[in-house]
UniProtKB/Swiss-Prot annotation:
Species per Swiss-Prot/TrEMBL record: Acyrthosiphon pisum secondary endosymbiont phage 1
Keywords carried by this UniProt record: Antimicrobial, Bacteriolytic enzyme, Cytolysis, Glycosidase, Host cell lysis by virus, Host cytoplasm, Hydrolase, Viral release from host cell
Entry function: Endolysin with lysozyme activity that degrades host peptidoglycans and participates with the holin and spanin proteins in the sequential events which lead to the programmed host cell lysis releasing the mature viral particles. Once the holin has permeabilized the host cell membrane, the endolysin can reach the periplasm and break down the peptidoglycan layer.
Active site, renumbered: 15, 24
Name of the protein in its database record: Endolysin
GO molecular function: lysozyme activity
Amino acid sequence: MHISEKGLVLIKRYEGLRLKAYQCRAGRWTLGYGHTHNLNIGDVITQEQAEAFLREDIAQVTALLNTQIKVPLTQNQYDAICSLVFNIGMTAFTTSTLLKKLNVGDYSGASAEFMKWSKAKVNGKRTPLPGLIKRRQAEKALFESA
């Protein structure tokens, strides 16, 4: 499967576009639409470069999902999971209870797991972040609208 335009819009809405590298609330250097690889303080890009980074980052996410998910998904379910994985990272997803529940066909149980990913480390402590709570609510609603 591939992410749809609706899925890309969801990711862009919650990641936001930043053309200059900044440190996110969790302390990671970020640029464009949530791109975090090979960045240096002070890096600046164009919107076109941000779009290219997003396509590259999404390609990695979809490649992972297409090998790890063993059950059929609707496009909305796939898009919701793409957004989640884009945000939490591939390693976190592959070891998640959400994936385990999904792969045994427990779609309801998988949906319930989204909200467990609404915290980030801030000053060394796992803290609920309002932006993550809203994002997880949107992803969960999209997943359930299958």
